[in-house]
């Protein structure tokens, strides 16, 4: 087994050797909870969930940390705006909402979206506001080592001195003189306009609840500092992988790396970044109306179909959304579930699952493993999955039950790794009967998702009615359709 991942810092695909044998440590940036989740947030979470699942499948015990930024200029500004006279709330906004209530409410929306799409809960999910003492300690370390200073204007701000750290710009391979000023505070208090805030002194008019006492005056932490302090608490001063969206490379991750290493921490061994989501080749923008939210996707398709779509591209590539994207994903999921449903119909509830026993599908499984080992190449892995589905269908048609069973074994392994078996709302038990029922119902829901995406409402209603007659209740919600069995 040789795992290889692209490291942004070295700009090359390198062999992944965990710092501790048999274990892996991963920190990836969660959301700044200032609004509803957008597809970029969820695509990132799915990418690092796939990574976690694959590392686990490869026998590593993985510790995952995903932070919550619950104090931020934008959160405070949004809360303040909600108290203004004449405030006109947009969907999801509440008049007169305190910043901490706003942050918590949106945090719960993110958790709902993650859960609906089968994103595994991290080992730790720390909030920035719960780690102020750790942030104070890190700032003091940087001051003591000559890499940070209190602001020159008595504002209570504390800044990182970028000129004091010769490696600043290493992650993104930029020359410091070519960088723009850090737009996080009044530059009059800085030695250099590029210096960034570690601590922000309280400003007039800001709520007292958004301020903490510190040796430099009351205030709140800077965004970049928060992540460095939290990752060090939960994973130590050196860990395996730091992940996040491509848009976080600069300034966020550049600043994280600089301040952590300047404090004497080796920090991340690998930096991994996922690509953005576009709309028909263009950057999504509310101003031009070319956006689609996870909630809107879940109104059009089942959670597994949405997960398939958001997770199907290579994590480093751009994922482009088109009006037909969910239809295509639904058709792919329907092919997988169609094979599984036919296999259950043939074999009953006895799957005969034996991990490693794949018969004629062994080559496809080996191709799947090779793809995932090679910088998490999900497109190649999906090709191997669909090849196995085709082989399984052929075996069923030919009456080759042994090969069909082994193809089913392979499909179960692959879908487990990709998170495509995580069905929100299913009643899960350990019985084979429940597993068989889930496969059959999900095959029907995938067909229904295709019908809905094509606006074939009569076909969609017919599938729902058939399931209802069989004792399966389907409910359409903001997080997509869920199902349950009728109660006696």
Swiss-Prot record:
EC number per UniProt: 6.1.1.16
Xref: InterPro entries: Cys-tRNA-ligase, Cys-tRNA-synt_Ia_DALR, Cys-tRNA/MSH_ligase, CysS_C, Rossmann-like_a/b/a_fold, tRNA-synt_1_cat_dom, tRNAsynth_Ia_anticodon-bd
Principal location class: cytoplasm
Reaction(s) this enzyme catalyzes, per UniProt: tRNA(Cys) + L-cysteine + ATP = L-cysteinyl-tRNA(Cys) + AMP + diphosphate
Classification via SMART domains: DALR_2
UniProtKB keywords: Aminoacyl-tRNA synthetase, ATP-binding, Cytoplasm, Ligase, Metal-binding, Nucleotide-binding, Protein biosynthesis, Zinc
Binding site for Zn(2+): 29, 227, 252, 256
Cofactor note: Binds 1 zinc ion per subunit.
The keyword Ligase appears for this protein: yes
Residue span of motif 'HIGH' region: 31-41
Binding site for ATP: 286
Gene Ontology cellular-component annotations: cytosol
Motif window: 'KMSKS' region: 283-287
Signal peptide stretch: none
Family from the record: Belongs to the class-I aminoacyl-tRNA synthetase family.
The protein's name: Cysteine--tRNA ligase
Organism per entry: Pseudarthrobacter chlorophenolicus (strain ATCC 700700 / DSM 12829 / CIP 107037 / JCM 12360 / KCTC 9906 / NCIMB 13794 / A6) (Arthrobacter chlorophenolicus)
């Amino acid at each position: 087994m040789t795992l290889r991942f692209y490291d942004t810092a070295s700009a090359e695909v390198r062999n992944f050797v965990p710092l501790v044998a048999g274990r892996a440590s991963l920190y990836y940036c969660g959301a700044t909870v200032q609004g509803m989740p957008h597809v970029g947030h969820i695509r990132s979470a799915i990418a690092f969930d796939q990574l976690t699942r694959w590392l686990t499948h490869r026998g590593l015990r993985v510790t995952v940390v995903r932070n919550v930024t619950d104090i931020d200029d934008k959160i405070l500004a949004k809360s303040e705006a909600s108290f203004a006279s004449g405030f006109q709330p947009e969907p999801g906004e509440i008049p007169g909402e305190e910043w901490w209530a706003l942050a918590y409410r949106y945090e719960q929306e993110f958790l709902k979206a993650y859960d609906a799409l089968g994103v595994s809960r991290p080992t730790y999910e720390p909030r920035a506001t719960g780690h102020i003492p750790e942030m104070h300690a890190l700032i003091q370390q940087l001051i003591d080592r000559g890499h940070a200073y209190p602001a020159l204007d008595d504002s209570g701000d504390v800044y990182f001195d970028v000129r004091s750290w010769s490696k600043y710009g290493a992650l993104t391979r930029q020359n410091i003189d070519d960088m723009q000023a850090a737009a996080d505070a009044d530059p009059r208090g800085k030695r250099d306009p590029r210096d960034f805030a570690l601590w922000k002194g309280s400003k007039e008019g800001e709520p007292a609840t958004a301020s903490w006492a510190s040796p430099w005056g009351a205030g709140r932490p800077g965004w970049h500092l928060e992540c460095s302090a939290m990752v060090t608490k939960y994973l130590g001063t050196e860990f395996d992988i730091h992940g996040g969206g491509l848009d976080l490379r600069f300034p966020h991750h550049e600043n994280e790396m600089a301040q952590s290493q300047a404090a004497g921490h080796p920090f991340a061994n690998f930096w991994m970044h996922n690509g953005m989501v576009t709309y028909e080749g263009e950057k999504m923008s509310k101003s031009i109306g070319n956006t689609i939210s996870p909630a809107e996707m879940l109104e059009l398709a089942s959670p597994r179909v949405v997960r398939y779509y958001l997770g199907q591209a290579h994590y480093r590539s751009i994922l482009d959304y088109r009006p037909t994207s969910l239809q295509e994903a639904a058709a792919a999921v329907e092919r997988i579930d169609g094979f599984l449903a036919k296999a259950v119909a043939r074999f009953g509830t006895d799957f005969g699952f034996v991990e490693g026993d794949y018969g004629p599908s062994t080559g496809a499984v080996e191709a799947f493993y090779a793809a995932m080992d090679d910088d998490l190449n999900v497109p190649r892995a999906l090709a191997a999955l669909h090849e196995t589905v085709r082989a399984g269908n052929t075996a069923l048609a030919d009456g080759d039950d042994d090969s069909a069973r082994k193809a089913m074994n392979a499909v179960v392994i692959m879908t487990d790794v990709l998170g495509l078996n995580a069905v929100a709302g299913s009643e899960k038990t350990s019985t084979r009967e429940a597993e068989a029922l889930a496969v059959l119902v999900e095959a029907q829901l995938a067909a229904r998702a295709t019908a809905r995406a094509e606006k074939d409402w009569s076909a969609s209603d017919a599938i729902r009615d058939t399931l209802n007659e069989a004792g399966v209740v389907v409910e359409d919600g903001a997080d997509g359709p869920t199902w349950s069995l009728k109660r006696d």
